[in-house]
Amino acid sequence: MTDVEHYESLLAEGPFDTESLTVLVVAGATQQDVATALGIDLAADPTEYPEADDEEFSAYAITDVEGGVLAVEHSGYADPSLDALRALSAGGRSVAVVRDNIQAHVRFGCARDGEVVFDDDEYLFLDDPSPVPAELRPLFDLAWVDPEDEDAEDDADAVAVGLAMAEVVTGLRLTAEDLQRVADSGYRLAPSLVYLPDAD
């Protein structure tokens, strides 16, 4: 099973509706580090995911995984800002985010040592793939739709490809147990619409 197939299986059999989803993976961080970067009050009691539509807030579930932290939210509109990625990767850490939403905008972003390495709001349709790090390019190419190729097809699951790239960046391989544990951990409110794709 390839890395992408591993994540396709996790998504297909896991506890989440993947139509709208943000997955944040941080190596070397604590839950408090992640909560602070996302604007979450970790002292608040966890609850079920809020059902009401709220443009200002979503909610994250956070859990420890071997070597770091996994955080998940279900709106696809509360993915972390670039500043949050920088903060989470400071001090030798690494972080990656994969986001899909009802607009079918699939984001992949990553940072190391306090610097954003790559980020794109719709990475499948990137006009110029040259900014993609060489270590990610073989996986990226599985999902990328080349605008110059009239016969291009996006058969690969872009979220699964994103998670495979997140593993390359962070060194953390997510498991079915990780996904179930984060789903069972409960949710805490987090602000929405904090990501600005073109922010420096």
Q: What do these predicted regions represent?
A:
Residues D3-A134, L139-P147:
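Hydrophobic alpha-helical segments that drive targeting, anchoring, or assembly
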Residues V4, L10, R112-D200:
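Long, compositionally biased intrinsically disordered terminal regions
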